[in-house]
Amino acid sequence: MIATPNFVNLSPDDYLELEANSSIKHEYIDGEVYAMAGATDTHVTIALNMAIALRNHLRGSGCRVYISDMKVRIQKAKSERFYYPDILVTCDQRDRDTPTYKQFPKLIIEVLSDSTEAFDRGDKFMDYQSIDSLEEYILINTRHPRLEIFRRQDDSWLFNTYSLSEDTDDPTFHIISLDFTEKIAAIYEDVNFNLPEN
């Protein structure tokens, strides 16, 4: 996300109207609107690999997988936010009623980049934690094969790291909320870690 807001003091309805007519995606934080930067080959490849694997696993389950063009709406007592996660999964029927955003995700995944990593780990994760339906939050590294999974347990979040290293034989990771297991290597298929970030 770009640090300087492009618009300020917009209502949520005005923001949604702006997004419906904009060729550029924006995230919304309490009336301020921020343009989003484009993604790299590595980022897009990782997100697509994960989304395809999840979609294949969830086919026929009633759960829906969305990639980076679907917003998640977060409403708190005195705050309202709209973010574009790289991947979100919702199994809640109420999300079928809102075609441009979802409010009840079970899983959110962010693919890290140099420009967004601090925000994805910090303020954005704090906002995501306020979503009652969210059971797991995953950060996928783009510099080396590593996934970090945060799982809600009561009032706290448990943390697990899964990585691909030379001393392990085809390791897997598990997303408990979706009963999904996959090889780490499959998520990084066709990824070239030597490509520049920009």
Model regions and ranges:
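Gly/Pro/Ser/Thr-rich low-complexity, intrinsically disordered segments predominantly at protein N-termini
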Residues: 1-198
